[in-house]
């Protein structure tokens, strides 16, 4: 039987933050990042309901209010550049104002979760049959497996990776074929970076790279260096980890808090096909043209 929401005793905000730090210390985050507790309510209260989201948009704030969440954990920090004012003229300012007005705490882990062993990049890596895996840039002084990006040794046909990745992110994937690659190309090395990974992945020797987004010219640079590129859209390469983290956090809090994933958080980009049959066969058609 499902536990009734009003039976959760909750924990103090400081205790929840401590568990979040235990999972992935904010000291692991990139120096440019803005992570940790970003909004602390003026009035202390028990944290009974925790909403997880990839991006804190206005629809997500509305959802948090409707579901009476006392804490929002937003993977991307909504407060990144310093705010010079909090008015109703910009959506990010309205988001912050709503949290302050309703005593909702806000925490963001961002790149600390990326580096975590068992974090965002490892979640995305599970789309590949892993023979071996290591960080592209290990985090000094951290446990083994901690660091930026992932480099994987595998043995899979390219078409198999594409199909597996689509199932992993539960969405479509953009494919940029390397010159000379076909659907039957055996992929033996993969570079992975959730989010926007071009700068980290640049220069690595891999048959394939998987990331969320990169520019047109960055894609061309990879494909002309014999590396196929798979793009998931930025947040689609990250969001699925929230469902893995949800029970982890609940357990670490002794099941005293209700932890749930936003139902309205989604990537702003969607693929609209003018002809669904053409869309479904596009992947095969591209390969046919390259194999002639």
UniProtKB/Swiss-Prot annotation:
Q: Name one GO molecular function term.
A: identical protein binding
Superkingdom classification of source: Eukaryota
Question: Pfam families annotated for this entry?
Answer: DUF34_NIF3
Coiled coil regions in record: none
Question: InterPro entries from the xrefs?
Answer: DUF34/NIF3, DUF34/NIF3_sf
**Could you name the Gene Ontology cellular component terms for this entry?**
cytoplasm; mitochondrion
Family of the protein in this entry: Belongs to the GTP cyclohydrolase I type 2/NIF3 family.
Write the protein's name: NIF3-like protein 1
What species is this protein from?
Answer: Drosophila melanogaster
